[in-house]
Amino acid sequence: MATPIRTVRQLSESLCIPYIDVLLPCNFCNYFLSNAEKLLFDHFDLHLVWRDNLVFGCCQGCARTVSLLEFVLYYQESYEVPEIEEILDRPLLQIELRCVTCIKKLSVAEKLEVVSNGERVHRVRNRLKAKCSLCRLYAI
């Protein structure tokens, strides 16, 4: 069985077309992602959605909207970093965190920022979230 195509880069390679020529509609608004949004989609470690042999991504506007709605509708609780490390019995660096604002997967450096700034980690829909460095910088 072939490996599923999960990134825009893999999609462009499998179709043998240049990355910038990939037309990828947003799963939510159906507008095509810009080249910058396609790059961010892969950089944020998001995965393509396949439905009826059609492929969809997620534009930045919809990613932020979905993230906000998820937080408002499905927020469970917040933890201090030592609490979440104790609950999961793993250090924060081994725990997957996504940005609460833009859904980017947090890097090691961003996780260390969460620790050094004494920020809280939120459980939303049984997933752990905190702010990435860009969203923290712009306070959005």
UniProtKB/Swiss-Prot annotation:
GO terms for biological process: DNA-templated transcription; regulation of DNA-templated transcription; symbiont-mediated perturbation of host apoptosis; symbiont-mediated perturbation of host ubiquitin-like protein modification; symbiont-mediated suppression of host innate immune response; symbiont-mediated suppression of host type I interferon-mediated signaling pathway. Keywords: Activator, DNA-binding, Early protein, Host cytoplasm, Host nucleus, Host-virus interaction, Inhibition of host innate immune response by virus, Metal-binding, Modulation of host cell apoptosis by virus, Transcription, Transcription regulation, Viral immunoevasion, Zinc, Zinc-finger. A zinc finger (unnamed) spans 26-62, 99-135. GO terms for cellular component: host cell cytoplasm; host cell nucleus. SUPFAM superfamilies: E6 C-terminal domain-like. It holds the Pfam family E6. InterPro entries: E6, E6_sf. It is found in: Host cytoplasm; Host nucleus. Coiled coil: none annotated. GO terms for molecular function: DNA binding; zinc ion binding. Plays a major role in the induction and maintenance of cellular transformation. E6 associates with host UBE3A/E6-AP ubiquitin-protein ligase and modulates its activity. Protects host keratinocytes from apoptosis by mediating the degradation of host BAK1. May also inhibit host immune response. Belongs to the papillomaviridae E6 protein family. HAMAP family: HPV_E6. Forms homodimers. Interacts with ubiquitin-protein ligase UBE3A/E6-AP; this interaction stimulates UBE3A ubiquitin activity. Interacts with host BAK1. This is Protein E6. It comes from Human papillomavirus type 1. The gene is E6.
